[in-house]
Amino acid sequence: MRDLTEIRQQIDQIDQKMLALFKERMGCSVEVAEYKRGTGKAIYDPVRERQKIDALTKDEDELIIKKSVEEMFLQMMSISRRYQYS
C-alpha cells in the first residue's frame, strides 16, 4: 500500500495537469465564441453538448463514473458558455 503523502502528491500533479488543460479548453472556447458570433450561430447548442456527453460516456460501464463524467462535463460546458457570453 502506498503512503498517503505519496498518493496526495500524485493527485496534486494530476490536478495541475487538469488545470492546464482546462485553461487550454477555455482558450478554445473563446475561439468558438468568436466563430459563432462571426457566423451568426447561437452560443448554446444543446444538441452538440448532448453528443459530446454521449461520446465521452458511451464506453464507460461503471455507472458512478459515467454519471460523474457527465456532471463534470455539463458543468464545464456551462462555465464555457458563460465565458463565451462575456
What label would you give each PLM region?
Residues 1-86:
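Domain-level signature for soluble enzymes in the chorismate/prephenate branch of the shikimate pathway
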